[in-house]
């Protein structure tokens, strides 16, 4: 006799992963979509401010979906405030985030394919071997590429590290159950993303999210070829890995100095190291 499992149980089990998939899809659909509208109209129908506002709105929307939409934040949360559930769900959530970003980029391309072809007939990559006569490189619509003035990718890595650290610091504050002064977490994440974009967005396009860059980059490889990975000295490695370290640092700093709740590996380690007089023991 077959056992019937209610559909609601299926949904509840899949919900964390569906939330990450849908949330990240929306993030890229909105974010890369506004970049496409700005770039393909030579910033006539969108500008740097509207690009920042759209990305920030997409991040705030993910809060309502209940998703982190960022593997760096998801991993940092599992490391800094670990639970068995977080670690059990970590692989599935990360895969869902990358898949959502890939599909989101595909939908952006589906919308703007004709406009891309008209604006950049050669389908070129920033820093690639094919030069556009007009100086247009449409691959930058989908993934991030560093500004031409950078002497090395290490300089760009600094920006990505700081941006991801600030983002994780803010996300940790939002997730702090004892942060009574926080009345509107969605607005805080919106404001934080606007601030990061306005202060750090120009030089690296502020990926601060491995899925935001690698998912669309992987899709763009179908259209633009392997140069999306090799361009700019294999720059793709920077937004894929650096935000992870930045997020761990930002979340760790928040918990070390601000967090007063339970379940923080950083706070627990500091409490264990304190002497009876409140000073750090060196014994």
Give the positions of each predicted feature.
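Membrane-interface helix-loop junctions and terminal tails of multi-pass membrane proteins
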Residues: 1-283
């Amino acid at each position: 006799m077959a056992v019937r499992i209610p559909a609601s149980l299926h949904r509840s089990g899949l919900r964390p992963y569906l939330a990450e998939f849908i949330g990240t899809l929306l993030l890229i659909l909105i974010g890369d979509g506004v970049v496409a509208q700005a770039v393909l109209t030579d910033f006539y129908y969108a500008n740097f401010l509207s690009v920042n506002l759209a990305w920030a709105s997409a991040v705030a929307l993910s809060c309502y979906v209940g998703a982190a939409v960022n593997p760096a934040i998801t991993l940092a949360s599992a490391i800094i405030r670990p639970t068995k559930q977080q670690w059990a769900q970590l692989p599935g959530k990360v895969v869902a985030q990358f898949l959502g970003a890939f599909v989101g980029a595909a939908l952006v391309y589906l919308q703007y394919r004709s406009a891309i072809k008209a604006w950049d007939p050669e389908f070129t990559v920033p820093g690639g071997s094919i030069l556009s006569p007009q100086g247009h490189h449409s691959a930058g619509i989908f993934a991030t590429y560093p500004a031409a003035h950078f002497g090395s990718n290490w300089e760009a890595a600094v920006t990505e590290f700081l941006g991801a650290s600030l983002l994780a610091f803010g996300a940790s504050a939002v997730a702090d159950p004892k942060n009574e002064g926080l009345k509107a977490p969605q607005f805080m994440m919106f404001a934080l993303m606007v601030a990061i974009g306005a202060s750090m967005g120009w030089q690296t396009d502020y990926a601060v999210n491995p899925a935001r860059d690698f998912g669309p980059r992987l899709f763009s490889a179908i259209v633009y070829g392997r140069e999306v990975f090799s361009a700019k000295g294999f720059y793709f490695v920077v937004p894929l890995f650096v935000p992870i370290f930045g997020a761990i640092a930002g979340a760790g700093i928040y918990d070390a100095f601000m967090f007063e709740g339970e379940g923080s590996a950083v706070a627990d380690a500091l409490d264990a190291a304190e002497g009876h007089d409140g000073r750090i023991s060196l014994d």
